[in-house]
A protein has these predicted regions:
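N-terminal pre-Walker A segment at the start of P-loop NTPase domains
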Residues: 3-49, 188-231
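A cross-family "folded-core" feature that marks the main globular domain of proteins
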Residues: 60-61, 71, 79, 87-92, ...
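An accessory alpha-helical subdomain
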Residues: 2-3, 148-200, 322-365
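Glycine-rich phosphate-binding P-loop
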Residues: 57-76, 224-260
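N-terminal accessory targeting/assembly segments
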Residues: 23-82, 234
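Conserved nucleotide-sensing/catalytic segment adjacent to the nucleotide-binding pocket
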Residues: 12-40, 77-148, 260-335
Length: 374
């Protein structure tokens, strides 16, 4: 692949531009709850859906082609029509599908309870209620298609293994680049900016009690490419766009996070999908202020280039260029593997469609909506 093709593949793209137009507002929010990362598949389901504000979770079973995502989209649609704050939790591998819905005012969530993002119930039958979309399957008809389904499933798994190998290798190069650059980061200047930015976005009176920390992921390394949402910016009254330079944004967010914890602020954190140790966004609900790396509309830019000794970095420019080019090529291969995995998944679902009675699926969906909204 030439450099232009590689850059096109790995560049972050807005979900609205790549897949479909959506509203990202204070009432309608879109996130991910898992990531394809250098560590393999990482799930934040327990952190997000284990939140004490959620009093009931409907766990959807079944499998490919059983209509789970369609069910959740129907729940989200009714929730929005009723004026509830609705978090759409998209699948990190197939962003056009949903893995979950959270209805804030009702304290209710509906989530995909199947692998790989399984959720461990806290009180099954009390807090967590099982729903089985698989009841709509004709299992005898599916059994006749088993050889095709097995072959496609194995091919899909192979592509995921390949993607994680490339992501792990790209992660090693990213770590190496950060270590080379760190001596040329103006840490004191960066820290002062991060601290003052957080303090300006926080209430005048700080709490001595720990603030509540929530997790919502803004971006995904997916079969559809490098896709991000702008729901931090959509929920905010004031948005700061953080422009990275040679990894300085990671350090900036680390310092901002430390200060926010010291101040006892409630905050919502987003982590990079490639590396779960890297923060790429912080939202403060009390002041409705967002610091994020993904926003088309924003109030102020914090350019991290100002926190680097650019003359010093010239000394390692060639090494950084080599690492960046190699890392980009590895990421491009990871995206290709994920795209292939996505195609195999679609073919698996196509095997299930003729073996599913969607009138039963519709009935299950109606009963679920009745339980939630009655």
């Amino acid at each position: 692949m030439d450099n232009h093709t590689v850059k096109e593949i790995i560049s972050p793209k807005s979900y609205c531009d790549m897949i479909e137009k959506i509203d990202e507002t204070k009432k309608e929010r879109h996130f991910f709850a898992a990531a394809n990362s250098k560590n393999g598949f990482v799930s934040y389901f327990d952190d997000i859906f284990g939140d004490e504000s959620i009093s009931r979770i409907y766990l959807l079973g079944g499998g490919p082609g059983s209509g789970k995502s369609t069910m959740m989209k129907r729940v989200a649609e009714i929730s929005k029509k009723n004026g509830y704050t609705t978090d759409h939790i998209h699948c990190s591998s197939s962003p056009y599908s949903l893995d979950g819905v959270i209805i804030a005012e009702k304290g209710i969530a509906v989530i995909d309870g199947t692998a790989p993002h399984t959720y461990i119930p806290y009180a099954a039958g009390v807090r967590e209620i099982n729903i089985d979309p698989g009841a709509a399957w004709n299992t005898n008809a599916l059994f006749k298609r088993r050889n095709t389904i097995y072959a496609l499933t194995d091919a899909k798994k192979k592509q995921y293994r390949k993607a994680y190998i490339y992501l792990r290798a790209a992660g090693l190069l990213d770590t190496e680049s950060r270590e080379m650059t760190d001596p040329y980061i103006l840490h004191e200047k960066l820290q002062k900016n991060a601290v003052s930015s957080v303090l300006s976005a926080s209430p005048k009176k700080h709490s001595s009690n720990p603030g509540k920390i929530s997790i919502r992921i803004q971006r995904a390394v997916s079969s559809a490419g490098n896709i991000y949402f702008e729901s931090f910016a959509g929920a905010a009254d004031k948005t700061f766009l953080i422009n990275d330079f040679r990894g300085a944004a990671k350090i900036w967010f680390d310092e901002a996070y430390i200060q926010a914890k010291k101040s006892g602020l409630d905050m919502t954190i987003s982590y990079s999908p490639e590396d779960p140790a890297i923060i790429d966004g912080i939202y403060f609900p009390a002041s409705k202020t967002a610091f994020t790396m993904y926003a088309e509309k924003f109030d102020k830019i914090i350019n991290c280039e100002r926190f680097a000794d650019k003359r010093g970095i010239i000394n390692i420019k060639q090494k950084l260029a080599f690492a960046s080019k190699t890392r980009s090529s590895l990421l491009a291969e990871a995206y290709k593997a994920l795209a292939d995995a996505g195609r195999y998944h679609n073919e698996i679902e196509a095997e299930y469609y003729p073996c599913t009675d969607y009138s039963i699926t519709d009935k299950i969906t109606s009963e679920l909506c009745e339980k939630i909204f009655s």
